Amino acid sequence: MTPNKIILSALLLLLPNLIWAQKQGDSFRAYIYNNTYNVYLRINFYDQDVTVPGQELYGKLPGYLGKLHNSFCWVITSCEVKNEKTAELQLINDFGSEDLTATLTRENDSIYVLKQGAGSTIKVPNNGKWQKLPKTLEFKRK
């Protein structure tokens, strides 16, 4: 075997490990959405540097749940990444009148599931009324 073939073989063997290492830590740095309810999560649980557009008063946060074409949001006030697939969240609505705990789980590379826990039920504006979101809601990565 020539030295060039040895180097090429070594690189090909290491390449999958390098790609996998780059994806580590990206599970909870994403924009994920639910088309059924027109809601989305913009999150970065690692750097916690997300700002809510038009509501910069909150400062940098782990993320928020927003509604398309609406400024209403549920702010993620704190989070704890348990592992690469699970994070626990504390959320509060932008009025400060309701709060809850929730769990966000990454099912695979593109599917996330938000499960509401103790506290209030997430409600979002929809055609002039409040719409309760289901206790378990699936999001897709964009």
Question: Model-predicted segments: where are they?
Answer:
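Bacterial Sec-dependent N-terminal signal peptides
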Residues: 1-25
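Central antiparallel beta-sheet cores of small beta-barrel/beta-sandwich binding domains
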Residues: 23-101, 116, 121-142
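Residue-level recognition of beta-strand termini and adjacent short loop/turns
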Residues: 83, 106-108
